[in-house]
Amino acid sequence: MLRITGGTVYDPANKIDGQIKDLNIDAEGKFCDAPVDGRTIDATGMIVMPGGVDVHTHVAGGAINFARAMTPEDHRRTQAFIRTKTRRSGIGGMAPTTFATGYLYAGMGWTTVNEAAVPVLSARHTHEELADIPIVDKSTLTLMANNEIMLDQMEAGEYERARDVVAWYIWAAKSYGVKAVNPGGVAAWKWGGDARQLSSPIEGYDKITPGTIVTQLARICDDLGLPHPMHLHCNDLGAPGNITTTLDTLKHLEGSRAHIAHSQYHAYGGDDWDTICSATAQLAEYFNTHPNITTDAGAVIFGDTVTITADGPWQHLLYKLTGRKWGNLDVENETGCGIVPYTYRPSNLVNAVQWACGLELLLLIQNPWQVFLSTDHPNGGCF
């Protein structure tokens, strides 16, 4: 039981805007009107608000472990968490270990994190690792947009069977919803290709296109009544001029719910690295007129980090652009994974545009319930 007294409370969901009031929490963790026995915290002069939710992060599973193994130099230079009577040991840095992840998130006021990319093949281990992260609540999303079994059903025109495949995978992986990464592009990467636009059949198939996958997978999530809509990492991430692909993707989502992940990486104009520019105004305008679509910003932080994504072809391109270390994983017939360390520099035109795009989206989208603050940890920087 807990009582918090004298704090300035902000709670938008309950329309509390800066009121000084006492809060009473009973033994079940619920608010109650009557004062309770137990611990009292004097929050005079402090702000009391609901815990933050990081809707898109990468904190557990094979990919983040691969990233940790690839960056031993970061372990040597980073903050160490020494074991005490109340705390387990760990390290921070670009990809903090499990215990450190929980402590660092809680220290910033976050109480829920969503591991946004889990292959079914490694879901069991991911849950074991999530159980090791203290304090915060956790959820996961299952990678589906390049799953060969589902794609085969879509190719055959068997929508109901494709829906049942997705339902079984979500049940088997014990996840909160569906993650779609570069739909069709990761499947094409297994053949050395990619899918940077939505209208051409993907490698290995005659009929289905990335647009088909986007439309049908969003519909499947709606038909299954999932609490979170399809969580979409669009095609052509990170490329100059990719705003065209992003807006085309959104047209394929008309009438469906969807969440666009790390939208900063999908909001670029220009036609080359020398002419890359922000196109966030176009994207924000779409969000402002389509309340069925939510997004997280994917803002970047200047400094060293390590990028991890199921978008294998993009990571191979990033490796060629930077000359840094590169790791690539093929997850059987489900998905893929790429790892590349990266440094965001304010003196770099592309990085400066990326930094500005993340802030612009947070400011230009009018409904604050429609946009989430995220760094796509660790891709845009450690949370």
Features from the language model and the residues they span:
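N-terminal metal-binding scaffold of metallo-dependent hydrolase/deaminase domains
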Residues: 1-49
